[in-house]
């Protein structure tokens, strides 16, 4: 019988809740001994690390007298607790917290593997990226972060397979944001036409829950830039940070200084119609050339160039033909020649992102 594996989970938002639902349905699931949210931590009591936290009933488990309750713990405290478990342990970080991500090396050096959709650790300063993987080697731990790009789509695993088998990746190009995919597929469809104004489409996306609470967090292009940073690094480029290459922001310059408060968001949405003519001109310029405009990211590995912004595409191209909020990522390589290897599908949503996390967890369990 294989030794038990212990699990700590941080974050119970949309992705975290979906992950716990999937975890509860796994046969032979690892033992859930720590569940942390912003202000409270639930723990299996030491030294037995038993009973464990029921993933299916995690919301009511806080009432269980045999479990230990605590306030928020520091990353060091969580790492010490998990490292003392009577078997290998895994941390699943379902947050987007940069402070927690910067502490991944602390966990990895203690032999705690890390599984996460949190982009911050892998797309911030290059020194942290290098430290994460050095710490994993030192602690004989594993790091899986498939869901940092493309939610549950096999983007990172596909790129790693290409690189690890000796293929030469020359270019990566695609639509990496479900939000921006929806915005442009609606605003400038490849088939038919749309009379919707840009501000109306942004409002619609916000109401449907496609955007971040502050749509500027999507429109500034930084989310796409972080994903491109991760892929470029896997492809062998030492990208220093996501702001070390050109990013075309879709936030009008006049609105960049509005605060990120609820009032600032309301002001942004109220004033966005003032700039509809600018986006209409971009759309019409593409139409006159028989094309459509899309927001894409690209990595030119040979030229060592990364770029994020608007680009025109033929209406019959795969990128132009995307529907809804789908992502598409094309890998151009020596082996695949002029026909790229394409990964396409839903690139956003709690369930599909959690699926990527759960699949990574299973891969780590297989390898421990």
Swiss-Prot record:
GO molecular function: homoserine dehydrogenase activity; metal ion binding; NAD+ binding; NADP binding
Reactions accelerated catalytically: L-homoserine + NADP(+) = L-aspartate 4-semialdehyde + NADPH + H(+); L-homoserine + NAD(+) = L-aspartate 4-semialdehyde + NADH + H(+)
Active site as annotated: 227 (proton donor)
Listed GO biological process terms: aspartate family amino acid biosynthetic process; cellular response to osmotic stress; homoserine biosynthetic process; methionine biosynthetic process; threonine biosynthetic process
EC code(s) of this entry: 1.1.1.3
Binding site for NADPH: 15, 59, 95-96, 119, 349
Cofactor(s) it depends on: a metal cation
Induction notes from the record: Down-regulated when grown with elevated levels of potassium chloride.
Cofactor binding, per record: A sodium ion is seen in the structure; a metal ion may subtly affect the relative position of the nucleotide-binding region to influence enzyme activity, and could increase the stability of the enzyme.
Binding-site residues for Na(+), renumbered to this chain: 146, 149, 151, 153
Keywords (A to Z) from UniProt: Amino-acid biosynthesis, Metal-binding, Methionine biosynthesis, NAD, NADP, Oxidoreductase, Sodium, Stress response, Threonine biosynthesis
Annotated pathway: Amino-acid biosynthesis; L-methionine biosynthesis via de novo pathway; L-homoserine from L-aspartate: step 3/3; Amino-acid biosynthesis; L-threonine biosynthesis; L-threonine from L-aspartate: step 3/5
Binding positions for NAD(+) per the UniProt entry: 12, 14-15, 95, 349
Record bears the keyword Transport: no
Binding annotation for NADP(+): 15, 95, 119, 209, 212, 349
Residues binding L-homoserine: 212, 223
PANTHER family, per the entry: HOMOSERINE DEHYDROGENASE (PTHR43070:SF5), PTHR43070
Protein family membership: Belongs to the homoserine dehydrogenase family.
UniProt function note: Catalyzes the conversion of L-aspartate-beta-semialdehyde (L-Asa) to L-homoserine (L-Hse), the third step in the biosynthesis of amino acids that derive from aspartate (the aspartate family of amino acids), including methioinine and threonine, the latter of which is a precursor to isoleucine; production of homoserine leads to a branch-point in the pathway as it can either be O-phosphorylated for processing to threonine, or O-acylated for processing to methionine.
Protein name, entry field: Homoserine dehydrogenase
Species this chain originates from: Emericella nidulans (strain FGSC A4 / ATCC 38163 / CBS 112.46 / NRRL 194 / M139) (Aspergillus nidulans)
């Amino acid at each position: 019988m294989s030794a038990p594996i212990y699990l700590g989970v941080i974050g119970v938002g949309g992705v975290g809740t979906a992950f716990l639902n999937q975890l509860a349905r796994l046969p032979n699931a690892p033992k859930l001994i720590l569940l942390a949210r912003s202000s409270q931590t639930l723990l299996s009591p030491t030294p037995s690390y038993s009973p464990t936290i029921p993933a299916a009933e995690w919301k009511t488990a806080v009432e269980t007298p045999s479990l230990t309750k605590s306030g928020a713990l520091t990353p060091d405290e969580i790492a010490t607790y998990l490292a003392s478990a009577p078997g290998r342990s895994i941390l699943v970080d379902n947050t987007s917290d940069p402070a927690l991500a910067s502490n991944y090396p602390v966990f990895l050096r203690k032999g705690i593997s890390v599984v996460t959709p949190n982009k911050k650790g892998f797309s911030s300063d290059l020194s942290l990226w290098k430290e994460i993987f050095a710490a994993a080697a030192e602690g004989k731990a594993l790091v899986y972060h498939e869901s940092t790009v493309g939610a549950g789509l096999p983007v990172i695993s596909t790129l790693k397979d290409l690189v690890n088998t000796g293929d030469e990746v020359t270019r990566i190009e695609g639509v990496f944001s479900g939000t921006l995919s929806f915005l442009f597929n609606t605003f400038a469809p490849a088939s038919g036409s749309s009379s919707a104004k840009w501000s109306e489409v942004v409002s619609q996306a916000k109401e449907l829950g496609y955007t971040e609470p502050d749509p500027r967090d999507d429109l500034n292009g930084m989310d796409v830039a972080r994903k491109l940073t991760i892929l470029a690094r896997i492809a062998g480029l030492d990208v220093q940070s996501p702001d070390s290459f050109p990013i075309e922001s879709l936030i009008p310059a006049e609105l960049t200084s509005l605060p990120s408060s609820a009032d600032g968001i309301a002001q942004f949405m109220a004033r966005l119609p003032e700039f509809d003519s600018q986006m209409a001109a971009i759309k019409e310029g593409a139409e006159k050339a028989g094309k459509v405009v899309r927001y894409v990211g690209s990595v030119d590995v040979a030229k060592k160039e990364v770029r994020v912004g608007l680009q025109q595409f033929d209406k019959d191209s795969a990128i132009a033909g995307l529907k809804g909020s789908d992502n598409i990522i094309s890998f151009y390589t020596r082996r695949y020649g002029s026909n790229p290897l394409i990964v396409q599908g839903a690139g956003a949503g709690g369930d599909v992102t959690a699926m990527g996390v759960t699949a990574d967890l299973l891969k780590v369990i297989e390898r421990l």
